[in-house]
Amino acid sequence: MQFLSQKLLSRVIVIMAMSCSTLLFAAEVGESALDLSLPLIVNQAQNAETVSLSDHQGKIIYLDFWASWCPPCLVSMPIMNEMRNRLQSQGLPFEVIAVNVDSDVEDGMDFLLDKPVDFIVLTDPQGETPARYKIKGMPTSFLISAAGVIEMKHEGFKQSDAAMIEKEILRLSELSQ
């Protein structure tokens, strides 16, 4: 009986330790963004096969987790593409990095063939990065300052959200100058 109690206790301790370690690496507002390195699904301007968040250090990043089966995700993509292009043309150090989480990469690619974007789109069909970022639903986005700090977490997307996101990007741009 004592052996079973010790075995059970050791399992509980291991499970608790694993839970705590996951929480230590969760992405929260006010903390440094977790780096990622994922394969490209599409990007005309990139020649690399994988892209890391750290490759864009010094830029404000809109990190967006999306899936082809998510209606709000599909609404956000062209809006964020237009915003990215407009802000970059004004000289803002801003980039959108989207992470597609479809288990079948072809689903994300099909959407992008139909509605191409100019920003970086990565793929994570195993869902490891969304798990590290504690994503609960789609879309979920993070606004990351030029210093690499998560300034905002946003769940869902409505067309009216774009103005609020842009206002926050402009605020971060002013702070980083």
Residue ranges with predicted function:
Residues F65-E82:
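Conserved redox-active cysteine motifs that mediate thiol-disulfide chemistry
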Residues F3, M18, T22-P39, Q177:
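N-proximal helix/coil linker or "cap" segments that precede and/or mark the start of modular domains
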Residues Q2-I13:
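Bacterial N-terminal signal peptides that target proteins for export
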Residues K59-I61, F65-W69, G137:
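Short pre-active-site segment immediately N-terminal to redox-active cysteine/selenocysteine motifs
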Residues L92-V105, F119-Q126:
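Thiol-based oxidoreductase modules, predominantly thioredoxin-like and allied folds used
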Residues S37-I61:
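A short beta-strand-turn-helix
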Residues M109-A146:
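Short, internal strand/loop/helix patches
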Residues S145-Q177:
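Thiol-/selenol-based redox modules, centered on thioredoxin-like
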